[in-house]
């Protein structure tokens, strides 16, 4: 599925992605310059940093967009495997805590035509892959956006991959109920690479 087909069904989401992530892959009208802008780099290897085994710690806001400040915590593992030479990857997560266990699968697919990633997530509770998060990386930071419904109201969803090193990275999920003006983080995960022989 191309990004444009997805966004045709959701023009509001397209506008948000363009506004919040300038690398969204659609040219904007700009004043004429003496030289043409450099083409966007191929992002096929944006997730290469994540291949392998990880330990993870997750903080999850129990009731997002309700004013709640009650968080629950989980610890566990994540494994990410390369598919199609890096044009796709599969991530598995298995974490547990006082609030229970979360088992999830992340499928990430790269579209070379738009130079964007499509991230789909399913948990073992219902197996639904859901609508994709769409975006890419710029200067070591990944931003991905989606539009969903939460408790009967339309919201925007944002993933941010940050603090990427050879041994660690962070992932934050946030929701916005006001069209992207403000964001409330509700899933904060830190990852540490499992060292060989450890």
Model-derived regions, located:
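N-terminal secretory signal peptides that target proteins for export/translocation
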Residues: 1-7
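Hydrophobic small-molecule pocket/channel-lining residues, especially in calycin-type beta-barrels
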Residues: 28-198
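Bacterial N-terminal signal peptides
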Residues: 10-21
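Short, flexible coil/linker elements and helix-boundary hinge sites characteristic
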Residues: 1, 21-22
């Amino acid at each position: 599925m191309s990004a444009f087909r997805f966004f045709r069904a959701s023009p509001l989401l397209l506008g948000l992605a363009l506004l919040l992530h300038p690398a969204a892959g659609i040219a904007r009208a700009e004043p004429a310059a003496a030289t043409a802008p450099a083409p966007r780099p191929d992002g096929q290897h944006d997730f290469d940093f994540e291949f392998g085994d990880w330990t993870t710690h997750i903080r999850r806001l129990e009731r997002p967009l309700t004013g709640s400040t009650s968080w629950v915590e989980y610890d566990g593992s994540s494994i990410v495997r390369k598919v199609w030479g890096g044009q796709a990857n599969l991530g598995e997560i298995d974490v547990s805590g006082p609030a229970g266990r979360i088992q999830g699968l992340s499928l990430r697919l790269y579209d070379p035509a738009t130079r964007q990633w499509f991230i789909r997530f399913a948990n073992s509770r219902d197996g639904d892959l859901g609508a994709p998060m769409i975006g890419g990386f710029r200067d070591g930071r990944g931003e991905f956006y989606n539009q969903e419904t939460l408790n009967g109201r339309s919201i925007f969803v944002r993933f941010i991959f940050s603090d990427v090193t050879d041994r660690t990275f962070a992932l934050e999920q946030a929701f916005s109920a006001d069209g992207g003006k403000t964001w409330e983080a509700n899933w904060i995960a830190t990852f540490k690479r499992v060292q060989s022989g450890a």
